[in-house]
């Protein structure tokens, strides 16, 4: 898995317990995974179709640097599936894991369309 993007945890990223808000990290994951999918398919015409179980393993606090790892795990006819791991940059401890995030390529009418890619993207 390659870790590409990093974020510094700031006070506005926290929940009332002063730890990283789950909704915030999910927003970042969806954005980072979408960028990864767009780059793999060479098209911005994608949508998030599904996410498998979201496993919150640990948390982060103000000042932590987290990084997002993405890996291509499956290529379908109109879709690709990505695995994601968010971890603490310094300790390498996993914070959130998602085994499958599915993106679908859409045509100009918003319908799924074959992307013509293989596992060797």
Show the residue positions of the predicted features:
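Hot-dog-fold acyl-thioester-processing enzymes
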Residues: 1-50, 104-121
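Short alpha-helix capping/helix-loop boundary micro-motifs
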Residues: 51-55
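HotDog/MaoC-like acyl-thioester-processing domains
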Residues: 1-5, 56, 61-62, 73-121
């Amino acid at each position: 898995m390659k870790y590409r993007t990093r974020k510094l945890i700031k006070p506005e990223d926290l929940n009332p317990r002063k730890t990283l808000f789950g909704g915030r990290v999910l927003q970042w994951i969806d954005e980072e995974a979408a960028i990864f999918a767009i780059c793999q398919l060479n098209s911005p015409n994608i949508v998030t179709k599904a996410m498998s179980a979201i496993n919150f393993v640990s948390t982060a606090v103000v000042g932590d640097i987290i990084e997002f790892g993405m890996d291509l795990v499956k290529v379908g006819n109109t879709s690709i599936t990505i695995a994601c791991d968010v971890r603490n940059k310094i300790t390498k401890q996993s914070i959130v894991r998602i085994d499958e995030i599915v993106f679908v390529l859409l045509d100009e009418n918003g319908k799924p369309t074959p992307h013509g890619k293989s596992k060797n993207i």
